[in-house]
Amino acid sequence: MEEHQALVIDNGSGMCKAGFAGEDAPRAVFPSLIGRPLQRSIMVGMGNKDAYVGDEAMSKKGILALKYPIEHGIITNWDDMEKIWHHTFYNELRVGPEEHGVLLTEAPLNPKANREKMTQIMFETFRVPAMYVAIQAVLSLYASGRTTGIVLDSGDGVSHTVPIYEGYALPHAILRLDLAGRDLTDYLMKILMERGYSFNTSAEREIVRDIKEKLCYIAFDFEGEMKKASESTAVDTSYELPDGNIITIGNERFRCPEVLFQPNFIGMEAAGVHETAFNSIGKCDIDIRKDLYSNVVLSGGTTMFEGIAERMTKELTAMAPASMKIRVVAPPERKYSVWIGGSILSSLSTFQSMWITAEEYEDAGCGIVHRKCF
């Protein structure tokens, strides 16, 4: 194992983050998507592939049908996923997987069969010498320098609140919220339509995602912000589309991410992220709640909105017992903190005995993943 640096691959619903253990940021960050030509005939004779991965698929999005093999944080299309991993090794990192240990990440409460399938593909298709599967939220907590806390991890496909005590996730208290970046993008498309701007295709949706990432923010006081927006143009701002047209966006800027706190905006009967975190803490032993409230760690791209930590603090303070000290931590690198945690973990000397080796896999089969990764 020692002679080659381990690889860390964080497979998110929206983006794949990959790189080398011990480095402080991923080398490759690309969309977790596969594009297939809409019409076979157009592409004839251009030496075209039957499938494009990542950025290349994104750049040809006008003539491709785009599909994401990871839905709500969980791999649903294994053939496409294998293509993404192949692309990661050979095109993005330019390494031979048979020479490197690979640390993969998984969603909390990932079905057992899924971890087994990941293990099988790594050893049998890619012939890796060693691998490990770690829970995303736990890695984010490590990256923040903690071993106890509650992580609100919200990416493109799913959000989770994961209480962690002394390095171990507490499965009975993990809550999943099927509301994340992709839903916010959809909602922004919908409310921009009310303004008369129409975005329909998968290509136009990527434009809306960009608007969301660049211009949206979370209001500290939603009602107050709505009132302010109706009385003045203080929140109005403009965005230039790829064709040069300029659109104006106003209260949509904070109405869009407000869905995280009020899922009923999109017709979802679910608790908002603040209430989900509160409920998660409530499922934990009373003796550790204080440690969780004082270490609420945000992670994932959908927690990148300006104002989220302040709003989260306000909402949790209103729900928690009065004497409780609440601290919400929003590390600046939280978009990549899962990957960073994986980079830290896989380069620790104490971790080297934790790898599942190819020999162990030969002996025990894919069930070994449940014994060695928890």
Curated annotation (Swiss-Prot):
Single GO term (MF): hydrolase activity
GO cellular component terms attached to this protein's record: cytoplasm; cytoskeleton
Subcellular location: Cytoplasm, Cytoskeleton
Family membership: Belongs to the actin family.
ATP-binding as UniProt keyword: yes
Species this chain originates from: Naegleria pringsheimi
First-level EC class: hydrolase
Keywords: ATP-binding, Cytoplasm, Cytoskeleton, Hydrolase, Nucleotide-binding
Catalytic activity: ATP + H2O = ADP + phosphate + H(+)
PANTHER family, per database record: ACTIN
Protein name in the entry: Actin-1
EC number: 3.6.4.-
Coiled coil spans: none
Function: Actins are highly conserved proteins that are involved in various types of cell motility and are ubiquitously expressed in all eukaryotic cells.
InterPro entries registered for this protein in UniProt: Actin (IPR004000), Actin/actin-like_CS (IPR020902), ATPase_NBD (IPR043129)
One Pfam family cited in the UniProt record for this chain: Actin
